[in-house]
């Protein structure tokens, strides 16, 4: 799988999910906190730069292996 760069559109800490806007202008991608590769509390900030892979989830594309840049 190839890595894609993007920016966090929004992320709801209490619900544990949000969306990432890919740099290539493609459709926003769903992200769940379990896909975030970090130690401690897994969260993302609006506008944060990230790198991720896309997998096909039950409800469409979702981000996997999300790394903060």
Curated annotation (Swiss-Prot):
Taxonomy, superkingdom: Bacteria
Chain's gene name: cspE
CDD domains referenced in this protein's UniProt entry, alphabetically: CSP_CDS
Protein keywords: Activator, Cytoplasm, DNA-binding, Transcription, Transcription regulation
GO molecular function: DNA binding
Subcellular location: Cytoplasm
Domain CSD: 6-66
SMART domains, sorted: CSP
Annotated InterPro entries: Cold_shock_CspA (IPR012156), Cold_shock_domain (IPR050181), CSD (IPR011129), CSD_CS (IPR019844), CSP_DNA-bd (IPR002059), NA-bd_OB-fold (IPR012340)
Listed name of the protein: Cold shock-like protein CspE
Any Gene Ontology CC annotation: cytosol
């Amino acid at each position: 799988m190839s890595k894609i760069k993007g920016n966090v559109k929004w992320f709801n800490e209490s619900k544990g999910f949000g969306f990432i806007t890919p740099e290539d202008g493609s459709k926003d991608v769903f992200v769940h906190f379990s896909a975030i590769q970090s130690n401690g509390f897994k969260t993302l900030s609006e506008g944060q730069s990230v790198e991720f892979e896309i997998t096909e989830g039950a409800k469409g594309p979702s981000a996997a292996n999300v790394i903060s840049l």
